[in-house]
């Protein structure tokens, strides 16, 4: 494998929901390029949609609001962030998988490196709690806290597969299905070769993992018991990872006596089935049968729409007809939309490089303003950049970047919450294709000028006559005699509405100074603290006493830590209205690998005699540090037959892959092992 970096691949599948309701008013103004859409259900008893469901303006139904994907956040972190999430206008959170999972890589807690975020998606059992996210009790507390704020909880589930390390599968699961051989389809350990072949797509393994026999009633019973436990703890729905790899009723059967009834059972035989919000991940890269999965689950993802939006936001054009096209063919428009998913971010799409934060925010605002679809916002790792996709801390369990609290994201979410039940009218003015208008009934108007030049408005609108405040910039715009006038600067977003506006004070911000690194070398490190719009700000270390601080104060941490130990700094703040914010940072005291350090490798039977060590570090630098181009540096053979590699310079956070050119020590597309001085490595 000739590659310098090893990007994790994971599947993500989403499961059904029953989506959007909209008004049936067919009147529209002729404003040039016009695309009016409505969903399959109609709402006629809510002409203003001015009443939201709680003090934060959040919606009681997940389908009506916006979802925040708390990617690799721990249950405790989500609990502490709940008021931040509510203030940002998200009505629903989505967790990473909460089931027991594979603890490879020495159970490391880095997103990528000495730890692997995608072990979330390698189940070893279907019971609540894992080493990455937290305990069942912490999950239950998280759900209870969410409900206090009016926030719903979606849980990512992955019943399609398990880890390929069968020794890690729990005895309870093996016994429940009658033996390990009965856990998988007959060819479940074979990789899919043709995704358009439904036999392969539904009965063979995806992403190097083993395909579970989801038609087996013993497995179904065990899995449904897990779902009901998750629901009892407070979950309000599920996202089904790799949904298109679980058979539909008319798909090929592995065992003629076992019908493809998985979807029927998990959508009807769970507690509160009619109240759950569920959707399935059906990536549009072959064999997806989108309409059929929407029919049996309730809703799916719309990955091709996200791909289009990522391209569109990078141009100046923003055609209404293309923006409203969900790219799902004739399927019902019951979809979860996104600008990027965690697969787009971590996989071949490399959206961390293709889209900067400004583009993510602007594109998101369009999804949130629309009536059709339920938008999901992926929370990128904290401090992530195009040069450093895993961020400045690279830790599983930490909250993601503060981008989900960006003022445009917040304004767009609150607009969405206020406009529930109002039909969308999406159009371009006659004189430009670079400006997008989204009217919501007669009560709200979203405008995005995607060009670099200002746009002077003087055009007809369905918006009622009156003066409207732009909830992004604060300026006022007037509608008189059915026309709106005013100027919109290049790349500016304007969100106009009065009815349903929830007036919340600006939140406090507490954080560490931008650029602060989570891993440090030396006896200690000094951290600069930031507090903005906070009447009170405190820090605590590892759950200790809270100490007040002011903007710019510094603290020193790490003096009493051993190398590789971690410490958590928690910052709390409060604004004048009493709204609270909280964020925790996980720091690790790093022991550098010094020049002259040796590591060893036991060559497996069947490998060639020439073995190389490929060492790399991509944890924080703008460029990946490597010891040599692939396959690395040839190792020397010791007297006892083990292979040895000696470091010729100091490294901060290196990983290593051993290879003979045809075989390698880590799995395909998995990161290397953390380097530990004098360790003897063996292939698992």
Where are these regions (language model features)?
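Active-site-proximal helices and loops of the catalytic beta/alpha 8
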Residues: 46-64, 80-86, 99-102, 106-121, ...
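Aromatic- and acidic-residue-enriched carbohydrate-binding clefts of CAZyme catalytic domains
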Residues: 50, 61-65, 101-144, 177-211
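Substrate-binding cleft of carbohydrate-active enzyme catalytic domains
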Residues: 131-167, 227
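Short proline/glycine-enriched turn/loop motifs at strand-loop junctions of beta-rich domains
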Residues: 371, 452-453, 461-466, 530-537, ...
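Low-complexity, disordered linker/stalk regions enriched in Pro/Thr/Ser/Gly
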Residues: 503-592
